[in-house]
Amino acid sequence: VQGNLTNNATLTTQAPSKVKFSGAANSNFKSNGATISNLEISKNNSTVTLTDAASVSGVLEFGSGTSSKMLLGANNLVLGTGASASGHDADEYVVTNSTGVVQKNYTDNTYTNQSFTFPVGDASIYSPLTSSLSGTASGANIKVKVTNADQPNRATTLPEATSYLTRYWSVDATGITSYSNVLTGQYNTSDDIVGTAARVKGSS
């Protein structure tokens, strides 16, 4: 697909089929509730914007060296229980530029250090968040978005308050008991740090 894609009927995709966006023009994608088996974003220095929520059951793939991004706006991108993401890097990723989130669903199971990297960033900087989940999942999901701003609830009275990131990740976990999670976010040291990097502390 090199232009816009709007599903006005019943769209059925099965592995190993995929919906692939390519070309140099920006595209809009409206799935109207259909679940896509595999979705590839291989635009040439351009974007794919969701105009409603989208669901992927297989692989969300970004083409290497294409400088292509998916813009969520107010819409969620849902990755199913068996879904994965590949090819994301500093030039190819999901932009959480409004209220939309990347949601990863989990099979009902007990997990120990189950790793998944959310391929998110803002309009200009790739800021993935890796989740290492432990706990028992039942109808579970984790939602993630990144915001290029000072965290609004950041402590300002502690001695370390003069050193902080001007970027934060919002994480919402649902349906997980005995929940623990090691979260590792990537940020840009030249753009995102105020003060001294060694004094920056994370919080939840």
What spans do the regions from the language model cover?
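Extracellular beta-sheet-rich ligand-binding/adhesion modules
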Residues: 1-203
